[in-house]
C-alpha cells in the first residue's frame, strides 16, 4: 500500500584523485576532488562531472559541462586550452547522461566563451 511517500535517496560521496592535466588550471595532477553520486541531480552548464569514457568503458574521466544539447545529451570539455591536452566531446562527441556518474560537491569558477560563470571556489 502506497502512502505517496518515496524513499529518500542520500547522495553517496566519492573521492577521486586527478590523473593528468586536462582540467588544469582548475585541477592539477594529484589533486583530490569530492564528488556526489548523480542520483536525481539536475546538471547545469559549468558543472564538473565524473564520466565513464564513451569508448573506453573502464576509464572514468573528469570534465566540465560546456553545453546541454537535450535533456540527456551533454557536450563536455576539459579546462586545459592547450591543443591535444584533453580527450573530450571534441574527440568523442556528445555524452549521454547515463555515462555521467557523479558531479562535484562544490562549484568551481571558470570562464566559458567570455562569460564568467559565478561559481564559488571551495577547496
Per-region residue spans from a language model:
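Extended hydrophobic leader/signal-anchor segments used for secretion and membrane insertion
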Residues: 1-123
Amino acid at each position: 500500500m502506497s502512502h505517496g511517500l518515496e524513499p529518500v535517496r542520500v547522495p553517496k560521496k566519492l573521492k577521486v584523485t586527478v590523473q593528468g592535466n586536462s582540467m588544469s588550471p582548475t585541477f592539477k595532477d594529484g589533486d583530490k576532488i569530492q564528488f556526489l553520486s548523480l542520483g536525481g541531480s539536475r546538471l547545469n552548464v559549468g558543472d564538473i562531472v565524473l564520466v565513464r569514457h564513451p569508448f573506453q568503458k573502464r576509464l572514468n574521466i573528469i570534465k566540465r559541462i560546456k553545453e546541454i544539447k537535450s535533456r540527456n545529451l551533454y557536450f563536455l570539455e576539459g579546462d586545459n586550452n592547450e591543443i591535444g591536452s584533453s580527450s573530450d566531446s571534441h574527440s568523442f562527441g556528445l555524452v549521454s547522461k547515463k555515462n555521467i556518474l557523479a558531479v562535484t560537491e562544490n562549484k568551481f569558477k571558470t570562464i566559458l566563451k567570455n562569460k564568467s560563470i559565478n561559481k564559488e571556489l571551495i577547496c
